[in-house]
Amino acid sequence: MKHTDIEVTLTHAEEHGLSAEEFSQICTILGRTPTITELGIFSVMWSEHCSYKNSIAVLKTLPREGGALLTSAGEENAGLVDIGDNLAVAFKIESHNHPSAVEPYQGAATGVGGIHRDIFTMGARPVASLNSLRFGSPKDPRVRYLVDGVVRGIGDYGNSFGVPTVAGDIYFEEGYTGNPLVNAMSVGIVEHHKTVSATAYGTGNPVLIVGSSTGRDGIHGATFASEDLSEASEEKRPSVQVGDPFAEKLLLEATLEAIETGYVVGLQDMGAAGITSSTSEMSARGIEKYGVGGIEIDLDLVPIREAGMSAYEIMLSESQERMLIVAAKGFEDKIIEVYQKWDVQAVVIGEVTDDNHVRVKHQGQVVANIPAISLVLGGGAPVYKREAKEKKPETPLANMVADSTLNFNELGLALLSRPNIASKQWVYRQYDSMVQTNTLTPTGQTDAAVIRIKGTNKGVAMKTDCNARYVYLNPLAGGKIAVAECARNIACTGARPLAITNCLNFGNPLKPEVYFQFKESVRGMGEACRTFNTPVTGGNVSFYNETFIAGQRTAIYPTPMIGMIGLLDNIENLVGSTFTASGDRILLLGNPQLTLDGSEYLVMQYGTPGQDAPAVDLEHEAQLQRLLVALAEQKLLHSAHDVSDGGLLVALAEKAMMNQEMPLSFRVHLSNNDKSETAIQQQLFSEAQGRVVLSAAPEAVAAIMALANDYNLPIQDIGEVVNQQTISLSINEQEVVNLPLSNVAHAYYHALEHALHLDEL
């Protein structure tokens, strides 16, 4: 029996991840039983990865307008934010978790390629890449294999494509052992009048496929990303796409030149679900905007690289480096000429129609004829409101010992050696961060990466962040903190936070406790974004990040990853994070209630994350951001670095070490009225929010303190930057830390390589 002759039944639908109710709904929409090609189309378009059917009801609660947004969330391939001078920033973050779990190198590489295509299909040139990675314990040999593959995949693709990888973060937690997270973010710059919409309109306008030929790689990749991982997932390596960064580089240049012709009407990347998603979504946008639309294509015209491909396979292929273009009728040859110049395929495969359907022909037959709106989010795709029920983590209480029994020198070195704290230089040295010559500082020298915008004095700051341990302990607070820390990092550079994108990584949404984590963390994100006036431009939801290995269920920590951009009006105001001058005063901004809950120290020393996330005061955070920007504009600061993972001692040590060309030490004197037996542990290692360590010339201190007072923010002078070989920290005039800077640096810079057993890779 031919593929096209299959008589579709409920069994086929269930094998495609569709429920009986959804199959019935499809039959009602079509007025008949779907063909196998139509079933494949519905299965990917109604998958969680494409339809957000389990998440959209919650996502709609996020602030999606305001600020400098030029597009609403979900309206286009990526968010678009006005930065003045007729320029806009396009940016987006997405996940490639499941592919990276079974094929780490290609999974990560194609994640990078896909997110860059989302940016340049809007007419923007990608100028920076970021990534956020989560792995299991580095003690596990398979985790080390995954780390190696993912890092090489990101580096090889990004370096070859010619876009700098400027920032990111990596955490190691047991819960990610079988299900790593690979979240990639791209940032691009575009002139307002050169932006392109992912919309099909204009009856009779030709539809072109451009880029690589279509193969069988990645078929059902979207569905694969919408189910739990298991041992059987290893068999789904064909669902992992294969990338070619050199082909994508040619595609980028050809596409930007084609846009310059003025004949590109609409443009969309072929990412998840390939030709299916691009034809469906572009048609639906055209109908929504203009009241009429649709696309008809002939698959016999699609360049394929494997013989005998069925319509089902061609429609669902996720072969990389492909895009769909709607051209102005009569000018398609002009566009084809541009692509031929760059040695990139460009072929007319159909046209825009006026019957509001996606119609697919193959070998002289219509194999799919579906109302476009029925396929997409906000149209006919199902929307579910799942049960949410809180299930507090059963974490043990920390059986803390008295400060008097502890050696804080040893504890400080041990904490700096933790994989979650230690330098990630082994990772970022594999990435080219300086290509395009716009990156203003080396990796790690600022709290957020900053890219210069050529032709202006402006810079764009960017950061990704999420401490999933906080979200696990308290989803509402954790969601707030993820946004707050991104904004704090951006403000530390002197930039003003503008907007966010998000990548929401969670377990199975059908489990009430998981859906509770999802809803509450999104609520926290929304509250923070409203307070900071940083609207949400869009993003990605990745559910089903749970694995079953040898019958044992393993769920990831809930990880709502935030990607944020900010604007630095004058790059001369850029503030670094490291000590720069001996004799500078060290100031501590912010004075919250100290707690060890959620801290890396508590996990290291007492084997528990505690009972709650640190508290966060959003109004305090907003004032902190405004103050940091004001201090930068008045050029009062030499450095600013927030207190986060590891607490105050780690923040001070990082400020001392991160400028490897000229490391400087510190003499810090703290006071503490807390008489408890664990007060020193709290003061050194608490990850309490809303704090920043500043350094400034002595003559600037009075002005800084006066400005902090104007913003009603507590600030204290805690010490001095010194050009010596040891760091020293005293509490109530008793020295509790005294370490050679060389020992501190060795612990910090070599621990990750040791933990990953790099000599064995």
Curated annotation (Swiss-Prot):
CDD domains on file: PurL_repeat1, PurL_repeat2
Localization per record: Cytoplasm
Main location: cytoplasm
Pathway: Purine metabolism; IMP biosynthesis via de novo pathway; 5-amino-1-(5-phospho-D-ribosyl)imidazole from N(2)-formyl-N(1)-(5-phospho-D-ribosyl)glycinamide: step 1/2
E.C. designation(s): 6.3.5.3
Top-level enzyme category: ligase
Cited InterPro entries: PRibForGlyAmidine_synth_PurL, PurL_linker, PurM-like_C_dom, PurM-like_C_sf, PurM-like_N, PurM-like_N_sf
Binding-site residues, Mg(2+) 2: D118, D269
Key words, A-Z: ATP-binding, Cytoplasm, Ligase, Magnesium, Metal-binding, Nucleotide-binding, Purine biosynthesis
GO biological process, one term: 'de novo' IMP biosynthetic process
Function: Part of the phosphoribosylformylglycinamidine synthase complex involved in the purines biosynthetic pathway. Catalyzes the ATP-dependent conversion of formylglycinamide ribonucleotide (FGAR) and glutamine to yield formylglycinamidine ribonucleotide (FGAM) and glutamate. The FGAM synthase complex is composed of three subunits. PurQ produces an ammonia molecule by converting glutamine to glutamate. PurL transfers the ammonia molecule to FGAR to form FGAM in an ATP-dependent manner.
Name of the featured protein: Phosphoribosylformylglycinamidine synthase subunit PurL
Organism this protein belongs to: Chlorobium chlorochromatii (strain CaD3)
Source lineage: Bacteria, Pseudomonadati, Chlorobiota, Chlorobiia, Chlorobiales
Protein's gene: purL
